[in-house]
Amino acid sequence: MNSNFFNKRAIGLVVENGIQKSRRVSGGGYFYVSGNQVNVQRGSCPRNTDYASQTILWGIDNGVTNKSLMRQRHAKQLTYRNIVGKNKNGDIIFIVSNFGGVVTIKDVIEEGVRQGIVEGVLFDGGTSVEYKFKDGWYSTSFTALSDAGKKLSGFGKPTTYIYVN
């Protein structure tokens, strides 16, 4: 899943194979892997992680929704969105838009709460939404903006993806 913008300068911390690729920014939240532990958390990320991607938007913290974020003008726009979170058992949950599934930030956060997310962060939305999920029984993928559309609009391929096996 794409977790940052279409350029080589990611916004926030990115760690790949234990090597920091970009620096932290204040605020937001993290999806990270440390050892065999996968976690989603607002506000902080351990220094020694194997993989990490920071977002500037958090949606749910300890079961409390980010009402301030939901009141922002950009949050009310209907577009493709996603939230990545964990439930009280520590299971990781991805909620993502698909073709025609344009929603507000409030919509995607509230769906996260309905699905049991207690810690959740929102990664880049709109034309940046791109994902592929595959296991032994099921596969689905989605790209908000085709490769041709990216070229025409001057976007490149995203450089930061979340990959979970």
What residue ranges belong to the model's regions?
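Gly/Ser/Thr/Pro-rich low-complexity, intrinsically disordered segments
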Residues: M1-N165
